[in-house]
Amino acid sequence: MEKKATRIVLASAIVAGAAAAPLAGAGAAVAQDAATGHASFAKCQACHAVGPGAKNKLGPELNGLADRQAGATAGYQYSPALKSAGFTWDQSTFADFMQNPRTKVPGNKMAFAGMRDQSEIASLWAYLSHFNADGSSK
């Protein structure tokens, strides 16, 4: 009986480990995407800030961007177009916006022409979305 119980416990551990392996890989992929996104953020730094102590610049600070209402960063003077855009930032909306900000929200103030590489946009989102509203990391 003891041998059978040992086999069951061992089999359960193997199955649990196999189930967790893809999750560990996913975490590593997200971390890699965020690292790549950090490098891509260099294109944004002239106008935007993120992290502890970030302040509005030519563009709004981007802490807590995930699930934030568009045009709602305190203390930033948004264009009427972005104030009334009526969407919440999520990965899909961010990707659409970053491809061509002027097309997604005509009349917004963002001068950046956009990014064409979907993987770069996804990596940038992975980087930005790991910041809480106070600039701390999630």
Feature locations, PLM:
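C-terminal segment of classical bacterial N-terminal signal peptides
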Residues: V15-A28
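The canonical Cys-X-X-Cys-His
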Residues: A42-V50, L124
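Residue-level signal for the nucleotide or nucleotide-sugar donor/cofactor binding architecture
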Residues: Q32, A42, G86-W89, R116-S119
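Electrostatic cytochrome c docking/interface patches
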Residues: G25-F41, G51-P52
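Bacterial N-terminal signal peptides that target proteins for export
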Residues: E2-A16
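Gly/Gly-Pro-rich "capping" loops immediately C-terminal to redox-active cysteine motifs
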Residues: T36-H38, P52-Q91, F112
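C-terminal capping alpha-helices of c-type cytochrome domains
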Residues: A16-G17, D90-K138
